[in-house]
Amino acid sequence: MLLNTVQPGVGAKHAKRRVGRGIGSGLGKTCGRGHKGQKSRAGGFHKVGFEGGQMPLQRRLPKRGFKSLTARFVCEVRLSELNLLPVDEIDLLALKQAGLVAAQAQVAKVVLSGKVERAVKLRGISVTAGARAAIEAAGGSIE
């Protein structure tokens, strides 16, 4: 089979309807648009969501929440993910290179989730109280 010989199946494509070509075609005179009204006119259509002057749904519903502009710059790292890093001294750059935080991250925070199995030294990274206790119990330190 060649790409230039591929054709749609029989009956899969319908011929385009020619409108306004006489009463016998079934689509003459008004061309399937009915009589009068906004939808019968040329260029006469309303915007998406328009409800005929009634207050539209997106304006009837209350506003809710917001999108934080700082969320994309702050990342969390699990305690167990620190075991994946080959280095013992961990800073933001090391986390970025390992792919544990986003490239545009400016702040990282270590949270208590899992266990740290070796002594690690954190530099310039904030930690939760539980994570701090776990790191220091494993012989690590936080600067």
UniProtKB/Swiss-Prot annotation:
Any single Pfam family the record assigns to this protein: Ribosomal_L27A
MF-aspect GO terms: rRNA binding; structural constituent of ribosome
InterPro entries in the cross-refs: Ribosomal_uL15 (IPR030878), Ribosomal_uL15/eL18 (IPR021131), Ribosomal_uL15/eL18_sf (IPR036227), Ribosomal_uL15_bac-type (IPR005749), Ribosomal_uL15_CS (IPR001196)
Disordered: region residues: 1-45
Signal peptide as annotated in the record: none
Superkingdom as given in the UniProt entry: Bacteria
Biased composition (Gly residues): 21-31
GO CC aspect terms: cytosolic large ribosomal subunit
Gene3D superfamilies documented for this protein: 3.100.10.10
Biological process (GO), any one: translation
Alphabetical keyword list: Ribonucleoprotein, Ribosomal protein, RNA-binding, rRNA-binding
NCBIfam families the record matches: rplO_bact (TIGR01071)
PANTHER family linked to this entry: 50S RIBOSOMAL PROTEIN L15, LARGE RIBOSOMAL SUBUNIT PROTEIN UL15M
Family in the record: Belongs to the universal ribosomal protein uL15 family.
Role this protein plays: Binds to the 23S rRNA.
Quaternary structure and partners: Part of the 50S ribosomal subunit.
Protein's name according to its UniProt entry: Large ribosomal subunit protein uL15
Organism: Chromobacterium violaceum (strain ATCC 12472 / DSM 30191 / JCM 1249 / CCUG 213 / NBRC 12614 / NCIMB 9131 / NCTC 9757 / MK)
